[in-house]
Regions:
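Transmembrane signal-anchor hairpin modules in multi-pass inner-membrane enzymes, especially those
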Residues: 1-96, 100, 104, 128-134, ...
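Membrane-embedded alpha-helical segments of multi-pass membrane proteins
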Residues: 40-60, 107-118, 196-204, 250-257, ...
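A membrane-periplasm/extracellular boundary helix in multi-pass inner-membrane enzymes
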Residues: 149, 155-159, 243, 260-331, ...
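Juxtamembrane membrane-water interface segments that cap and precede transmembrane helices
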Residues: 30-37, 174-189, 381-400
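Long extracytoplasmic/lumenal interhelical loops at the membrane interface
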Residues: 326-341, 349, 353-406
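Membrane-interface catalytic loops of GT-C/OST-like multi-pass glycosylation enzymes that act
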Residues: 36-40, 190-194, 243-251, 394, ...
Length: 502
C-alpha cells in the first residue's frame, strides 16, 4: 500500500476511535477490566479502551511533531508540584493502611492522574477545525442520548415499582456497571446516581444551555426556534430529577439560574422603547424565579417517590428535637464533615507540599477530629479492615484533596491552570462570531459546573472535568487560527437572539 492509502486508513482509525471514546463516556465503571488497567478500582471508564489507541497513534505523535495549544503548558506546573509532593512524602515514613503501602498507593494515584491528563491532552488536540468541534459535540450527544434512554427506562420502576421489570434491568446492568441498580433512584450507566447526575451537569448541560442561550445548534434540523438541543435539555432535566442527587440537582438549579439572570442575550429594542436596567433585571428575576420554582416543584414531585431524597425536608416534621447539626447528620452529611475537617488538619500539618498524591488515607487516623467514630457508620466501615478490601478513605472533595495532598503549592498551580482556561473562555466570549460566542458561554457554564461539582468528588480518573477542559482548550486554539476561525457554512444553524433565548 502506498503512503496515501496508509494515511487514509490512519484517519479512518482515528475517527472511529474518537467516536467510540465520546459515545462510551457515560459508562464509568465497566465490569470487564483487566487488573492491569485498574480492574480493582471503582472508576473504570469504558472510554479508556479507545483512549489508549488514540493516545498511542495520535496524541503522542501530535505532541512530538506539531504545534500545540499554549494552554496545555499551564497544567505542567501542577504536575511538577504534584510530583515534588510525592517525593517529599517518601521522607515522612507513613505506615501502610489496610495493607496498602505508600508506594502502591502513590502508583495508583499517579495512574489516575495520568489517565486524566491523557484525556485532557487527547481532547485538546483531537479536533482540527470548527467542523471537528461540531462533530465531537454531536457524537457526545449520541452517547448521552443512549444514557438518557437507559435512565428513562430505569425511571419507570422508580415511579411504579415492578419486581420483574427491576430484575430484568438489574441483570442487564451487570454488563454495564460493577454496581447493581438502585430500586428507588436512576443511575444511568454509571456507578451510582450521583455520578450520573454530575455527568449530566458536567458533560451535557453546559453545551445544551449554551445552545439554547445563543440559538446556535450543531444540527441542521430545527423547527422555528426548536432545536435538538432544546429537546435534549428537557429530557436531561427530567431524567436528572430521578437521580435524587442533592449535589447534582443543586448544580442544575444554579446553572439554570445563572443562565437566566446573567447569560441571556438582550432584546433588540429600539431606543424609544428601551427599558431601564432596573425593569430589565426585575423581569429577569421574575422569569428566573418562575423557572426555578417550576423546577423545584418538579423535583419535589419526583422526590416524593424516594425516601432518601425526601429526608431533605422531612427532618423538621419527623424529629421533635431538631438542630442544624442534627439535620446534616440526618441527611448523611456527617461523614463529609469528618473528611473535610481531617483534610484541613492535614493541610495545616503539611502546608507547603501536603502528604503527596493519594496519601490522605495514611494520616487519617492521626488527623481525624476527636469524636466517636461509631456515630458515623460510613467512616467506621472504611476504617475497619476486611478481607479482600483495600479501598482507602478519600476527602470526597477535590479542593480539600488538593490542599491536603499537594499543599498550598498544588492548590495555587491548579488554580492558575483554571485561570488559563478562563482566559480561553473570555477570548471566545468576546468574539463577534455567533459560533464562537456559543463556545464562550457554554465553556463558562462548563467551568462553573466544575467549580460547583468539585465539592462532591475527588478522583482524577473521572473523565468529566478533563473532557470539559479539553473542549475549552480546543475551541480557543482552533478559533485563534486566522483562516479557520472565519464564519463557516454552518451559519444557518444560528438563529436570531430573540428566538434563541430561554
Amino acid at each position: 500500500m502506498n503512503k496515501a492509502t496508509w494515511t487514509s486508513l490512519y484517519e479512518v482509525a482515528r475517527k472511529i476511535c474518537w467516536v467510540l471514546f465520546l459515545v462510551c463516556l457515560p459508562v464509568t465503571s465497566f465490569p470487564f477490566f483487566p487488573p492491569a488497567l485498574g480492574g480493582g478500582a471503582l472508576v473504570r471508564p469504558l472510554s479508556l479502551y479507545p483512549l489508549i489507541i488514540l493516545f498511542l497513534i495520535f496524541t503522542l505523535p501530535t505532541i512530538l511533531r506539531k504545534s500545540l495549544p499554549m494552554t496545555l503548558l499551564s497544567v505542567l506546573p501542577f504536575v511538577l508540584v504534584a510530583f515534588a509532593s510525592s517525593l517529599v512524602a517518601l521522607l515522612h515514613g507513613f505506615q501502610p493502611a489496610l495493607g496498602v503501602s505508600i508506594a502502591e498507593r502513590m502508583f495508583r494515584a499517579w495512574v489516575t492522574l495520568g489517565l486524566g491528563l491523557a484525556i485532557y491532552l487527547t481532547v485538546s488536540v483531537m479536533a482540527h477545525t470548527p467542523e471537528g468541534l461540531r462533530s465531537s459535540l454531536r457524537w457526545l450527544y449520541v452517547g448521552f442520548s443512549a444514557a438518557l434512554l437507559w435512565g428513562t427506562l430505569q425511571a419507570v420502576y422508580v415511579i411504579n415499582f415492578s419486581p420483574q421489570y427491576f430484575r430484568l434491568f438489574s441483570k442487564m446492568q451487570r454488563y454495564i456497571s460493577i454496581r447493581p441498580l438502585f430500586n428507588s433512584r436512576v443511575s444511568g450507566m454509571t456507578y451510582e446516581p450521583n455520578w450520573f447526575a454530575m455527568q449530566i451537569s458536567f458533560l451535557l448541560l453546559p453545551w445544551l444551555l449554551g445552545s439554547v442561550l445563543t440559538g446556535y445548534s450543531v444540527f441542521r434540523w430545527r423547527w422555528r426556534w426548536l432545536t435538538i438541543e432544546w429537546l435534549l435539555l428537557g429530557w436531561a432535566v427530567a431524567v436528572m430529577a430521578f437521580t435524587f442527587s442533592r449535589a447534582g440537582l443543586i448544580s442544575l438549579i444554579l446553572l439554570i439560574l445563572i443562565s437566566l439572570l446573567f447569560l441571556r442575550p438582550a432584546h433588540n429594542a429600539s431606543p424609544a422603547k428601551e427599558k431601564t436596567h432596573l425593569r430589565t433585571w426585575m423581569r429577569r428575576l421574575i422569569e428566573a424565579g418562575l423557572a426555578v420554582a417550576a423546577l423545584v416543584g418538579f423535583i419535589y414531585f419526583a422526590g416524593s417517590y424516594s425516601i432518601f431524597f425526601s429526608r431533605l425536608w422531612s427532618y423538621w416534621s419527623d424529629i421533635k428535637k431538631n438542630s442544624l447539626s442534627g439535620y446534616f447528620d440526618y441527611i448523611g452529611f456527617g461523614a463529609r464533615f469528618t473528611y473535610a475537617e481531617t483534610a484541613l488538619r492535614t493541610y495545616e500539618a503539611y502546608p507547603l507540599f501536603g502528604v503527596g498524591i493519594g496519601n490522605y488515607a495514611f494520616t487519617f487516623d492521626q488527623m481525624m477530629p476527636d469524636q466517636p467514630v461509631a456515630a458515623i457508620p460510613e467512616v467506621l466501615r472504611l476504617l475497619t479492615p476486611e478481607v479482600d478490601r483495600d479501598q482507602l478513605i478519600t476527602p470526597k472533595n477535590l479542593y480539600l484533596r488538593l490542599l491536603s495532598e499537594t499543599g498550598l503549592s498544588g492548590m495555587a498551580t491548579f488554580l492558575a491552570f483554571l485561570v488559563a482556561l478562563l482566559g480561553c473562555i473570555i477570548f471566545l466570549w468576546l468574539s463577534p462570531h455567533p459560533e464562537q460566542k456559543f463556545w464562550g458561554k457554554a465553556s463558562l457554564l462548563g467551568l462553573i459546573s466544575f467549580l460547583m461539582g468539585a465539592f462532591t468528588f475527588d478522583s482524577f480518573a473521572i473523565p468529566n472535568m478533563w473532557v470539559v477542559f479539553g473542549l475549552i482548550t480546543s475551541a480557543a486554539w482552533i478559533y485563534r487560527r486566522p483562516v479557520e476561525s472565519m464564519p463557516t457554512a454552518n451559519a444557518q444553524n444560528v438563529i436570531t437572539e430573540g428566538h434563541g433565548e430561554i
